[in-house]
């Protein structure tokens, strides 16, 4: 029978190969910056690339009621899976999508959009995206959304 370990010890060489399975170290929650978010929003990184050929980043993002992102886009698109509360996602055409726990919304590469918690409940989603060819261009941040854009009455 194999022994179950919470975190396997490093090999005698002191280094692990990329193929070694490991428990990821827990990272502290980060409050997102006001230049990119309005209201209180926290991010917990779930997974990030280990090697140069990996692109996927996964994070749990928690929004206080009414909190929202600024307009932004992603070089390779983004998947967002709502896990708690009611989310509002909007695009430049004025479309507002209300997304509930268990639903996933996809934003194609380059589409300018925002995500937000509805005005009266906390919202949490899992964000999944791949880095752009130049990681600095993975997300392009733009101006803050207006209340009219948030409400879909622009």
Whereabouts are the PLM-identified features?
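A short, N-terminal "cap"/entry segment at the start of jelly-roll beta-barrel domains
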Residues: 2-55, 138-154
